[in-house]
Amino acid sequence: IFIVSEDLEDMDRGLSSFGAEIVQFNEVEQAAAQTEGISLILLDEFARGTNPEEGAMIVRAVTRYLDKQPSVSVLTTHYDGVAALASAHFEVKGLKDMDMAKVAEEIAASDGHIKGADIIASHMNYGLYRAQGAESCPRDARNICALLALKDEILKDI
């Protein structure tokens, strides 16, 4: 089992988080290639340390590469266009079945005793389901912003 995860910034070596991720990925890829049998490679939010456009291109290229390797690879990402390249696409159920009005009432009734983020987290479903076809990724960010009382002036521009 090989994992590339967390902030890997290495100031002693002069590496940014992104540079350190690439170094670690190369090490993982080489170790997996030398392993007999099938390896499990886990990439958590790979290429998050660079700009979103290049990060998405890198993750798509890595996905295509890993799909050809004798391994099982699991990538978590927020980048669009990656899932279409994967052999299988799973998503966190998230807030998909959440009743927004009910949660807004819970937050309003909490009188500040329970943080809104904690109430939202209590409704979060971290279960995975297999996404079908070109199903788009969940778009919960605006709803969360509204529940957490981001100013209306900002919300109207989202």
For each predicted feature, which ranges?
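ATPase nucleotide-binding head domains, primarily ABC-like/P-loop NTPase cores
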Residues: 1-158
